[in-house]
């Protein structure tokens, strides 16, 4: 079973992280999950859910505490065995910390370790509009080998619901790591 690390921050759009978690479970990945304190607040605010409710029934998920720097995810010698690391959604604070090597919590540490060990790192940055600092930090991440994905759904697949739009973005996240899926119709041209 392949491993994925998924970090969910407190940016608006926690639903992207939840959907990615559910799809990875369906695709039989083992997921190591780090949920920030603010992500729990946002989930409650945006969807009236708790993470306990979201995690119910998921078998291949291992939870790591946001401030546990002894987690195996904090170690490069362990993280190299992962298919990749997702930070979904990624707050601009988390983007800044990862881009500048500041480790305030396990999510920041996992991002930094992924970059230093060349483990694929994918950040779904959820902010609008971007300012110069955001763009510079995205450029830093990209230059270090990470991939920054905007939370921007397309419309060529003619979405009929919010779920269709979420599926498109999550599908793009999976595409970055070359994970097969059927979440949206591909462009036919």
From Swiss-Prot:
Give the UniProt keywords, A-Z: Flavoprotein, FMN, Prenyltransferase, Transferase
* InterPro entries membership: Flavin_trans-like, Flavoprotein, UbiX-like
* Protein name, as recorded: Flavin prenyltransferase UbiX
The entry assigns this protein to a family as follows: Belongs to the UbiX/PAD1 family.
Q: What is its EC number?
A: 2.5.1.129
**Could you tell me what reaction this enzyme catalyses?**
dimethylallyl phosphate + FMNH2 = prenylated FMNH2 + phosphate
Q: Which NCBIfam families match?
A: PRK06029.1 (NF004685), ubiX_pad (TIGR00421)
Q: Which GO terms describe its molecular function?
A: carboxy-lyase activity; flavin prenyltransferase activity
Keyword match Signal: no
| Flavoprotein among keywords | yes
* Residues given in the record as dimethylallyl phosphate binding sites: 156, 172
What is this protein's gene name? ubiX
Q: Per its UniProt record, what PANTHER family does this chain match?
A: FLAVIN PRENYLTRANSFERASE (PTHR43374), FLAVIN PRENYLTRANSFERASE PAD1, MITOCHONDRIAL (PTHR43374:SF1)
Source organism per UniProt = Aquifex aeolicus (strain VF5)
What is the top EC class of this enzyme, as a single word? transferase
- Where FMN binds, per the record, is at 10-12, 36, 91-94, 126
Question: Per its database record, what is this protein's job?
Answer: Flavin prenyltransferase that catalyzes the synthesis of the prenylated FMN cofactor (prenyl-FMN) for 4-hydroxy-3-polyprenylbenzoic acid decarboxylase UbiD. The prenyltransferase is metal-independent and links a dimethylallyl moiety from dimethylallyl monophosphate (DMAP) to the flavin N5 and C6 atoms of FMN.
């Amino acid at each position: 079973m392949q491993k994925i690390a998924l970090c969910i921050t407190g940016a608006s759009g926690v639903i992207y992280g939840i959907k990615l978690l559910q799809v990875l479970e369906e695709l039989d990945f083992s997921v190591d999950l780090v949920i920030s304190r603010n992500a729990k607040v946002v989930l409650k605010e945006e969807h009236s859910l708790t993470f306990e409710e979201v995690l119910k029934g998921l078998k291949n998920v291992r939870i790591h505490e946001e401030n546990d720097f002894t987690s195996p995810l904090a170690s490069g010698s362990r993280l190299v065995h992962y298919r990749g690391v997702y930070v979904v959604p990624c707050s601009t604070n988390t983007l800044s910390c990862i881009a500048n090597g500041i480790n305030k919590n396990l999510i920041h540490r996992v991002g930094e370790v992924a970059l230093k060990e060349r483990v694929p790192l994918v950040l779904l940055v959820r902010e609008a509009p971007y300012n110069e600092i955001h763009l510079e930090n995205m450029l830093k991440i990209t230059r270090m080998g990470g991939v920054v994905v905007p939370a921007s759904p397309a419309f060529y697949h003619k979405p009929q619901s919010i779920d269709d739009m979420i599926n498109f973005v999550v599908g793009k996240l999976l595409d970055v790591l070359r994970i097969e899926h059927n979440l949206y119709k591909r462009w036919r041209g």
